[in-house]
Amino acid sequence: MLESLLVPTAIVALAEIGDKTQLLALILAARFRKPWPIIAGIIAATLANHAAAGAVGAWVSSFFTESVLHWILAASFTATALWTLVPDKMDDNETSNARRFGPFVTTLIAFFLAEIGDKTQVATVMLAAQYPHLIMVIIGTTLGMLIANVPVVLAGNFAAEKLPLTLIRRLAATAFIVLAIVAVYSAMKTSGWIG
């Protein structure tokens, strides 16, 4: 039973290193500067996503080819990069949307959506099929996400206090553009457009 917890924890923690959700954690920490609601949102989103991974993962992948998923990912990264560059009032003070949704709900939704089709979701599906203790697998994959993302949230909160938000926004937009380029390359490769 312990193996059903420890192996998924290690696999997901390693898979998360350098993943887009770490960048998302950094952006949310810099934007909201409230690490604990963000961490709580990551926990809730990961539990919900990974609990549904076994059932939903196979269903969604049956509707889209790998190539289509790469194109969707490239478009979402490009849109996120552009959105990141646009200053909003939340940078200076909370708007009604920020008060209405806040860091917890924003993180919950963003992380849940970012994990759909992600390698950690796929890993969760495979691990749940391999190990008999589903609850331990879900707890393990959630712990792996926390091991990888909590330090980023805390560092992002610290960096936001020391660095101008404009610089953080530009760096994040650049990173999302790079991710979009990689996703376009993957889409072209899986479509057979390049060798």
Residue ranges and their predicted role:
Residues 1-17, 36, 92-114, 135-139, ...:
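Small-residue-enriched transmembrane helix starts and helix-helix packing motifs
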Residues 2-64, 123-144, 151:
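Juxtamembrane transmembrane-helix termini in multi-pass membrane transport proteins
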Residues 3, 33-97, 102, 154-164, ...:
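Membrane helix-loop-helix hairpins that form the core translocation module of multi-pass transporters
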Residues 13, 17, 47-48, 82, ...:
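Hydrophobic/aromatic residues within the transmembrane alpha-helices of Major Facilitator Superfamily
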Residues 86-92, 119-123, 135-138:
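Short, structured loop/turn "capping" segments at alpha-beta junctions
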Residues 132, 139-193:
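Hydrophobic secondary-structure block in the mid-to-C-terminal portion of proteins
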